[in-house]
Amino acid sequence: VADHGARVYGKAEIPLETYEIPLMIYSPKHIAPRQVDTLMTQIDIAPTVLGLLGLPYEAPFFGIDSLHERPARTRVALFSHNHDVAILRDNQLVVLGLGKTHQSLTYDPVAKSFKPRADDAALQGLGVAYFQTASDLFKTNRYN
């Protein structure tokens, strides 16, 4: 796994293609080779590795075990870029900006492009909840 680095670029509010980074887990004596194409972010690495080790994952963090989580759970990705934060779910992106601004977009992963769409109040609320909860847990020292 890697990080997108300092040169995140693009015309988009959140240039998603610069965040696409593969994760490789190599343990040939313990894990059969396979490719898993699922939405996951760096916050999912620890619970995924713990799941591979057969260990429980109970923590106040937002990551999930990307290999063993129930398929019914909808996966989300959280982003921070410049002064904006965003949440992505099922190719629907909501960008939350300064001054309570927001923008709802549909992401086309093949064309790597966005199309504006009607406000998605549910996804916007979920994004606000994730970021506000994380901020509150951090500010009040409850991340342990």
Task: Place the predicted regions along the sequence by residue.
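Solvent-exposed soluble domains appended to multi-pass membrane proteins
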Residues: V1-N144
